[in-house]
Amino acid sequence: MKWETPTATDLRFGFEITMYVSAR
């Protein structure tokens, strides 16, 4: 899944942070 839009990139970054915190 590759996103080019800045909004999608920011959303993906936030999603990774959420997954990281949930994985703790």
Curated annotation (Swiss-Prot):
Task: From the UniProt record, give the pathway where this protein acts.
Answer: Cofactor biosynthesis; pyrroloquinoline quinone biosynthesis
Pinpoint the Pyrroloquinoline quinone (Glu-Tyr) cross-link.
E16-Y20
Tell me the Pfam families matching this sequence.
PqqA (PF08042)
GO terms under biological process: pyrroloquinoline quinone biosynthetic process
Q: Does the keyword Transcription apply?
A: no
Write the record's keywords in alphabetical order, separated by commas.
PQQ biosynthesis
- Say yes or no: keyword Acyltransferase present: no
Disulphide bond pairs: none
Q: Which family does it belong to?
A: Belongs to the PqqA family.
Q: State its role.
A: Required for coenzyme pyrroloquinoline quinone (PQQ) biosynthesis. PQQ is probably formed by cross-linking a specific glutamate to a specific tyrosine residue and excising these residues from the peptide.
Q: What is this protein called?
A: Coenzyme PQQ synthesis protein A
- From what organism does this protein derive? Variovorax paradoxus (strain S110)
